[in-house]
């Protein structure tokens, strides 16, 4: 249980989970009001 690979795996899992959570927060939370939509800016 104390091998470096175990702790490295846990670290990567936590890093991936936190980046995913932050991306969902920015994409759908309150900061999403500041995001621009390039499709709305484009005029045909």
From Swiss-Prot:
May play a role in photosystem I and II biogenesis. InterPro entries: PSII_PsbN (IPR003398). It comes from Oltmannsiellopsis viridis (Marine flagellate). This is Protein PsbN. One of its GO terms (biological process) is photosynthesis. Its main location: plastid. Keywords: Chloroplast, Membrane, Plastid, Thylakoid, Transmembrane, Transmembrane helix. It is found in: Plastid, Chloroplast thylakoid membrane.
């Amino acid at each position: 249980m104390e091998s470096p690979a175990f702790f490295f795996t846990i670290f990567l899992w936590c890093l991936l989970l936190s980046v995913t959570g932050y991306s969902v927060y920015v994409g759908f939370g309150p900061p999403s009001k500041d995001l621009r939509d390039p499709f709305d800016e484009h005029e045909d």
